[in-house]
Amino acid sequence: MSETDEVVIYTDGACKGNPGPGGWGALLVYKGVEKELWGGDPSTTNNRMELMAAIAGLIALTRPCSVKLVTDSQYVMKGIQEWLPNWKKRGWKTASKEPVKNADLWQKLDEEVNRHQVSWQWVRGHTGHPGNERADQLANRGVDEVRSAR
């Protein structure tokens, strides 16, 4: 697969209160075609929404793909690149032998990542990066829909 065959997924999570109502957004771009995904949860955390955005973006791919996943979440980046291998070795426990927070979502993300060839890119949030800004708007749409459903 050449770089032009790569799917780029921009992800973001949002939470109004932490915990509180939250939303996630993902923008998938493939050969100039865009697909927008979003959703929310009435009681969640920003970290869970960041993870959900990445999971939803990867689940939306119907076959194994070459993926560049772009996030502004240091939590997701450090988790996937540094912490995850050790958590798995320790049976989903931290270095201090505590259960991993959000283990359900980390396990699902790990499962989805293993279906694809994924490279990860961190971008600073709220700096005008078009894909990240759009993912942020989608995440906030998820929050708004959860709040209006109450």
UniProtKB/Swiss-Prot annotation:
Binds 1 Mg(2+) ion per subunit. May bind a second metal ion at a regulatory site, or after substrate binding. Disulfide bonds: none annotated. GO terms for cellular component: cytoplasm. CDD domains: RNase_HI_prokaryote_like. Mg(2+) 2 binds at residues 12, 136. This is Ribonuclease H. It catalyses: Endonucleolytic cleavage to 5'-phosphomonoester. The gene is rnhA. Mg(2+) 1 binds at residues 12, 50, 72. One of its GO terms (molecular function) is magnesium ion binding.
